[in-house]
Regions:
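Von Willebrand factor
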Residues: 51-70
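Active-site-adjacent betaalpha module
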Residues: 1-21, 49-54, 80-197
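Short acidic, Gly/Ser-rich segments with clustered Asp/Glu that frequently serve as metal-coordination loops
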Residues: 28-35
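Active-site loop signature of alpha/beta-hydrolase-fold enzymes
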Residues: 30, 66-68, 162-163
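Active-site loop/turn elements of alpha/beta-hydrolase fold enzymes
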Residues: 27, 63-65, 159
Length: 197
C-alpha cells in the first residue's frame, strides 16, 4: 500500500477470512473499454487460475438488459447496447468462466442489488470477497462498498482492477475504498494468501 499511503498503518487492515470468493466484475466483450489497462485483465486471469487450484469459488458479473431497454435504470451514461443474449455481454475469452463458476446478471453498478448474489454467498458460507474487474470508480467501488456493508472482508487487488476514466479516478477510488472498508492489496499479497489455503 505504499503507493497510496506514505505511512500505511497495519491496524487499518481487516485482513482475509477463511472462505474467500473471487468476483470478476464486468469484464465483458462489450461496453466501454476505453483506458482499461490490459494488465487488469491479465492479472485477473492469473488470480482466477490460482483460485481454481485451491477450489475457491469464482463468480462473474455482467451488465445486460432487454433489447427494448425497459429494464435499463436511469443512468448518466448513454446506453451501452449491452443486450442479453448478444456477444457484447459475454465474458472476455481471457477470463471466461468455467462450468463450476457462477454468473450474475445485473442492472446496476452493484451486483448485490436485485440479484441472488447474497443468497449464493450465504450458501457458500463466504466470509471474504476478492473484487476484480472494471471500472474502479463505478462498479468496483459499488461492489466493494456493498460487500463491506454486508459484513464481508473485502479485498481489492490493485493490479486486477482498472478504470476507463483514467488513472486519477482509479487511484482516488482505491484510496477511498481502503480508508472506508476494503483492503486494497497487491496481487502478490492475494496470491500468497491463496497459496496458504
Amino acid at each position: 500500500m505504499t503507493h497510496y499511503f506514505d505511512k500505511p498503518q497495519k491496524s487499518t487492515y481487516l485482513g482475509f477470512g477463511e472462505r474467500p470468493v473471487i468476483l470478476v466484475v464486468d469484464l465483458m466483450k462489450g461496453g466501454s473499454m476505453n483506458g482499461l489497462p490490459g494488465r487488469a485483465v491479465r492479472n485477473t486471469r492469473i488470480l482466477i487460475q490460482e483460485a481454481r487450484k485451491k477450489n475457491v469459488p469464482i463468480g462473474y458479473t455482467v451488465l445486460a438488459y432487454r433489447s427494448d431497454l425497459k429494464d435499463y435504470p436511469p443512468n448518466k451514461l448513454a446506453s451501452m447496447k449491452l443486450v442479453m443474449g448478444t456477444e457484447s455481454v459475454k465474458v472476455m475469452d481471457e477470463v471466461a468462466p468455467g462450468p463450476e463458476d457462477f454468473v450474475i446478471i445485473k442492472k446496476t453498478n452493484s451486483p448485490f442489488i436485485g440479484t441472488n448474489l447474497l443468497l449464493l454467498l450465504t450458501l457458500m458460507q463466504a466470509d471474504t470477497i476478492i473484487v476484480t474487474g472494471r471500472h474502479t470508480s463505478g462498479c468496483i467501488r459499488a461492489t466493494a462498498a456493498d460487500a463491506f456493508s454486508y459484513g464481508y472482508r473485502t479485498i481489492v487487488p490493485e493490479e486486477c482492477v482498472g478504470d476507463g476514466k483514467g488513472i486519477l479516478p482509479h487511484k482516488a477510488n482505491l484510496c477511498d475504498l481502503h480508508i472506508r472498508g476494503a483492503d486494497v492489496l497487491t496481487l502478490r499479497e492475494v496470491l500468497e494468501y491463496l497459496g496458504k489455503l
